[in-house]
């Protein structure tokens, strides 16, 4: 058995390829397609956040490069967690709407230091993770009337 065959066998068992009627080649093509579909974020996210983030001793170009690397890493880690923990083929990356709000409204508009605003985002993320693991997320979603859910989806 070749290395590729053993790899295909491992991933096939791990992710249930037979049940999903797929194979490693199809999943690799799907992954590349997903990455290319969301790759615009690697350019736009650093451009948006770079307008608000200044780090002493680093040029704006260096800050933009750091933000691009962090964008790539966060998208890769989030997508891998979704794949291996939830067994779902979802590509996750930073959202431009919230990034624009963070950069232009909170940091530049309200004058809050970007470090403080980023700390608030981290705390918010931790709260959402706790709400999900405790099981409150489902109760909160169930409490929202369907018309509100539909209108929020349409508004976004």
Place the predicted regions along the sequence by residue.
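Short, Lys/Arg-rich, polar N-terminal cytosolic tail immediately upstream
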Residues: 1-22
């Amino acid at each position: 058995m070749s290395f590729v065959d053993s790899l295909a066998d491992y991933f096939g068992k791990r992710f249930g390829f037979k049940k999903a009627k797929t194979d490693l080649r199809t999943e690799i093509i799907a992954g590349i397609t997903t990455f290319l579909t969301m790759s615009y974020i690697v350019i736009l996210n650093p451009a948006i956040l770079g307008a608000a983030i200044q780090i002493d001793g680093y040029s704006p170009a260096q800050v933009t490069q750091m933000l691009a690397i962090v964008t790539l890493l966060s998208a890769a880690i989030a997508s891998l967690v979704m794949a291996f923990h939830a067994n779902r083929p979802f590509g996750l990356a930073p959202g431009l709407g919230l990034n624009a709000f963070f950069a232009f409204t909170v940091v530049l508009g309200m004058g809050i230091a970007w470090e403080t605003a980023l700390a608030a985002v981290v705390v918010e993320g931790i709260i959402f993770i706790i709400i999900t693991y405790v099981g409150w997320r489902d109760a909160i979603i169930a409490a929202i009337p369907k018309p509100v859910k539909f209108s929020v989806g349409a508004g976004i």
